[in-house]
C-alpha cells in the first residue's frame, strides 16, 4: 500500500525455467535455478497480495515435463495477476495459467487509464504508441511492453512513447505504474532540455550570417540589372530580392556585397 491505496505493477519476460545460458548468464546468474529463486523473491518482496500485477508475456519456458514445476513456481507469486500473452505462451501454458488461483485475466493486450495517463499493454513494442512528441505526456498513448530483453527501458523511445518492462531492464523487479510515470516524466524533461540546447546552438549558427545579410540588404540595395536599368522608367523586379541570380526577366545582374559581406 502507498498513500492508502493498492499499487499496480508491471513486469515481463520472467522466462522461469528457461534453461539456456544466454538467458540466465546475461542476467548475472550461474544457473537457471538461481535465476528462478531470485526472480520469485524479488517479485514477492515488491508485490503484495492486494496489488494488481500485469505480466506482459513469457512467464516460463521448458518442455511438457516442466509444466508442474512451472505451475508450482507461478503459484508462489503475490498479487492479482493479469497476463498479457507473449510469443512463448503456448496454448498448453495458457491452460496452465488459467488454473493458477491468483490469475484474474488473460489477454493479448490491455488498456489502462491511471492517474489520467493512458497505457497500452502488449508483449511486443507497438507503434500504437503516439508519435506526437509535442503533446504533453498525459495526451499520449504510452506503450508498456516486453519481448526484447533490453536493459534500457527507453530502448525504443525514439520510435514512439514506448517503455520496456522486462525484468532485464529493472534488475529483476516488477515496476509500479507510479514509478513508470515519474521515470517517463523525467525522460520527457531531459528531452525538452536537450532539444532546447540543440535549438539554441542551431540558432546561434544562423544568427550571425542572417544578421550580416540583413545589414547588407539595408545598406546596399541590389542595383537594377544592366538591361533593365538602361530602359527609361523601368524598375527591374530583381531589386526586390537579393537572392536572385537573375531578375524575373531572365537578365543576370550584379549583386556583389560590401567588403567582408556575403549572401547565403
Model-found features: residue ranges?
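Structured loop/turn residues at beta-strand edges in well-structured enzyme cores
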Residues: 48, 138-139, 223
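Cysteine-centered metal-binding/redox modules
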Residues: 202-264
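Core catalytic region of metal-dependent phosphoesterases/phosphodiesterases
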Residues: 11, 16-110, 206
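Short, Lys/Arg-enriched N-terminal segments with co-localized hydrophobic residues
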Residues: 1-6
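Structural motif
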Residues: 45, 134-136, 220
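Active-site neighborhood of phospho(di)ester-bond hydrolases with catalytic His/Asp-centered motifs
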Residues: 10-12, 54-58, 82-87, 121-122, ...
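Conserved beta-sheet core of the metallophosphoesterase superfamily
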Residues: 99-194
